[in-house]
Amino acid sequence: MVRERTKKLRGGHYGRGFKAGRGKGKKGGSGNAGMGKHKWIWMVKYDPLHFGGKGFTSHHISQVEVPINLGDVEYMYESLKRDGFVREENGEIIVDLRAAGYDKLLGNGNFTVKSTIIIDKATEKAISKLSAIGSKIENDGSSA
C-alpha cells in the first residue's frame, strides 16, 4: 500500500486553497501592474499620490520688484555717486535709482539731499517725505 503524500504548506502563501499561491500564476501581476484596475483599493489607501499631477510649472515670467527705503538711499548716497547713479545737470542733483536696479521707493527712513529721484514706483509716504524737503520723483519722464 502506497502512503498518501501530505499537503505541505510551502512558502508564505497560506490560506489560498489547494496548491494556490505556490507558483507565479496568481499574483495579479508584479510591481505596479494593475494599479488602475484590481489593485485600485490598495493604491487609494497606501499610495494615493500614485496617479495625477505633481503640481505644475508656471511659465509666466513674473517680474519681481526690487524696493529700496529712503534711509537706504541716504546711507548709500556716496556709493551711488561713485558708481555714476548720481549726477548733476543744470545745478540739479539727479539720483537714478532705476539705473541702479531698483523699482520701488519706500518711505522708511529719512533723505536729506534735495534732488530729483528717477524710479518707477514710489509709496505715498516716500513722496510726501521728499516733497517736504523740496525733492521730486520722476518715472518714465513724468514727475510723480
Curated annotation (Swiss-Prot):
Residues 1-32 are annotated as: Disordered. Disulfide bonds: none annotated. Keywords: Ribonucleoprotein, Ribosomal protein, RNA-binding, rRNA-binding. One of its GO terms (biological process) is translation. GO terms for cellular component: cytosolic large ribosomal subunit. Residues 1-13 have a biased composition (Basic residues). The keyword Oxidoreductase does not apply. GO terms for molecular function: rRNA binding; structural constituent of ribosome. It comes from the Archaea. Part of the 50S ribosomal subunit. Belongs to the universal ribosomal protein uL15 family. Binds to the 23S rRNA. This is Large ribosomal subunit protein uL15. It comes from Thermoplasma acidophilum (strain ATCC 25905 / DSM 1728 / JCM 9062 / NBRC 15155 / AMRC-C165). The lineage of its organism: Archaea, Methanobacteriati, Thermoplasmatota, Thermoplasmata, Thermoplasmatales.
